[in-house]
């Protein structure tokens, strides 16, 4: 029996890549495609809709969301309230929103996944960085993305910082009398260390965590050169959420 999937934001680069991934997996099938910019009514026999409300009564198992931070919270609530297990790759959730959605999913008995990053290598980077932070508490995070990305820092950088903060000896880095000659030059402050965001054309998704200590340094880096790198994680997420009864934040919980 195939898992029936709705993809929201299918006109975007991630959404369109997800469509091809689902079409190429015999265990999955497309139930519907949703995008406010859609002009067609169907794609290869799959019905297309402009609004989420039009698919509320549809028979489907999973709602895959690659829309925008502006809409993704309400979209995820909608999915849970209508019996679809959400797999969400759009970032920008607040901790309070994640807590609310987790509680709602438990109430509905539905699995779900909010993943700042679907690339397996990025998940490993986060785990390796958290391990290193126990021994190298002085660090900075640099994330680099394409120039159309709307949120900064990236969800991956925030998740990495959160994992590091759980194990790192808390301290403030830099000179005590440090002064920014240009506002923001030192990046965003997070628990005593800094996060830097780079936005340039030609990039896809990249991140490095740089650690420093007396006489040595350590750099952990991950690069996604193509959006196909995320599809293994999306595929895993779709197949795992239908087995679960509560939403999780981070792909690492499904590995």
Swiss-Prot record:
Alphabetic keyword roster: Amino-acid biosynthesis, Cytoplasm, Diaminopimelate biosynthesis, Lysine biosynthesis, NAD, NADP, Oxidoreductase
Subcellular location: Cytoplasm
Annotated Gene3D superfamilies: Dihydrodipicolinate Reductase, domain 2 (3.30.360.10), NAD(P)-binding Rossmann-like Domain (3.40.50.720)
Residues given in the record as NAD(+) binding sites: 9-14, 89-91, 115-118
Catalytic activity as recorded in UniProt: (S)-2,3,4,5-tetrahydrodipicolinate + NAD(+) + H2O = (2S,4S)-4-hydroxy-2,3,4,5-tetrahydrodipicolinate + NADH + H(+); (S)-2,3,4,5-tetrahydrodipicolinate + NADP(+) + H2O = (2S,4S)-4-hydroxy-2,3,4,5-tetrahydrodipicolinate + NADPH + H(+)
Enzyme Commission numbers on file: 1.17.1.8
CDD domains, alphabetized: DHDPR_N
Annotated Gene Ontology cellular component terms: cytosol
Biological role: Catalyzes the conversion of 4-hydroxy-tetrahydrodipicolinate (HTPA) to tetrahydrodipicolinate.
NCBIfam families: dapB
Family in the record: Belongs to the DapB family.
Name recorded for this polypeptide: 4-hydroxy-tetrahydrodipicolinate reductase
Gene source species: Streptococcus suis (strain 05ZYH33)
Gene name tied to this protein: dapB
